[in-house]
């Protein structure tokens, strides 16, 4: 910027001189961040952008850009994570601040079941395990346990029976689905005979 200095003495004589004034902005922006909570999606992933954590960052000359790091999260990041918001003004001054990013998994397992047929044994009993009903249930963050509403069957259960499979993931999210267990009794009756003597 060019400015002109004009000086007038007591006798009215005037003299002027031009000078260059260089204006610099060395003031960093004010970076302000907020803590947030995000949910993983069904694939076990989540991402954020600077606007998600920015809480009114500002600069007198204007903000040129913002970045946040890290900005992608997965099952290994569950819980509290520290992220850094970097704010750059139009004159390339930067400022940083941190926020807490809490990552949660609220997605229930994806359920796939199958119907099965089982046979009673010679004692009229049969039992199953969850893996016989499960047909590929999955969860992005891993499965912790499988459970069935009914494991044991007897003669009173011959025919179609509805059982419920419960799958719980590593973060306590549970889902259920039904399947049909058909119980069959194909064991022939045991016939016992004895010889007898009769008198005419």
Question: Predicted segments — roles?
Answer:
Residues 1-200:
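Proline-threonine-serine-rich low-complexity tracts
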